[in-house]
A protein has these predicted regions:
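Short, conserved loop/helix-junction motifs that constitute active-site signature segments
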Residues: 8-10, 41-46, 68-72, 118-119, ...
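Short glycine-/acidic-enriched loop or helix-start segments at secondary-structure transitions
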Residues: 26-28, 60-63, 100-102, 134-137, ...
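Binuclear metal-dependent hydrolase catalytic cores centered on His/Asp/Glu-rich metal-binding motifs
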Residues: 88-124, 142-155
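Active-site-proximal segments of metal-dependent phosphoesterases and phosphodiesterases across multiple
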Residues: 22, 26-33, 121-163
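Short, solvent-exposed loop/turn segments at secondary-structure junctions
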Residues: 2, 22, 57-58, 95-98, ...
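Core catalytic region of metal-dependent phosphoesterases/phosphodiesterases
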Residues: 2-85
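Active-site neighborhood of phospho(di)ester-bond hydrolases with catalytic His/Asp-centered motifs
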Residues: 15-20, 48-55, 78-79, 124-128, ...
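Binuclear metal-dependent phosphoesterase catalytic core
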Residues: 84-86, 155-160, 164, 171-215
């Protein structure tokens, strides 16, 4: 991923990355990618930065890129943790339903235990993956469209009702557009999928993230 292709707008107070800053599954190959991402992310002239890792970010999971290195660069790393900024409570969690052998993955039957840890008073929920049915459509191997978000996460979001939920993980592909912001009639929450590369075009920015105002 060439993060330098992203255009960071001026005048924003906080930038959030919701994971998959890297590509390699092998943590030893992943390490150099992650360190390059941190170098780039740290130079963004925005006063506050949050990073929630994704399933691709294996070098953090395996301890090759330690928390101290990230936070020493002015980046807040959230792994099932909260930070309060200007009175708003942000909760970051990296887990997604298991698919292959990646980091921070849990079987769908037990992943609700992770979501139970999301505080009821969360204002901004930062996950790596989407809730079921919201900006989570993709093509299955049989070329049929399927929704791959987490139903247990969707259930938890309806209870917590954060103002905003941020995620990535499921990319846009072919004629399906997942990157963007959506409001859903059954939720009081606004949803943002900030995946910046389309499936099949990894390394090429096809979406520049989302800019959202919240108070």
């Amino acid at each position: 991923m060439n993060h330098g292709q992203l255009q960071i707008p001026e005048g924003i107070d906080l930038v959030i990355h919701s994971g998959d800053a890297t590509n390699w599954a092998d943590p030893y190959r992943n390490e150099s990618e992650m360190r390059a991402f941190i170098d780039w992310f740290a130079t963004i002239p925005i006063p506050k930065k949050i990073f929630v890792p994704g399933n691709h970010d294996t070098s953090i999971d395996k301890g090759l890129v330690p928390r101290d290195l990230i936070e020493h660069r002015g980046i807040t790393l959230l792994i099932d943790q909260e930070i309060v900024i200007d009175g708003l409570k942000f909760w970051g969690t990296p887990w997604t339903p298991r698919y292959g052998n990646w980091s921070w993955m849990v079987d769908r039957g037990t992943i609700n235990r992770k979501w139970d840890g999301i505080p009821d008073d969360t204002d901004v929920l930062i996950c790596h993956g989407p809730p079921y049915g919201i900006l989570d459509a993709t093509y299955a191997q049989n070329n049929k469209v399927e929704l791959v978000g987490c139903s247990a996460l969707a259930k938890r979001v309806t209870k917590v009702e954060p103002q905003l939920m941020l995620f990535g993980h499921v990319h846009s592909t072919k004629d399906i557009r997942n990157a963007g912001i959506r409001t859903v009639s059954d939720y009081r929450t606004r949803f943002s999928n900030a995946s910046c590369c389309d499936d099949g075009k990894m390394g090429v920015v096809t979406s520049n993230g989302n800019v959202i105002e919240i108070s």
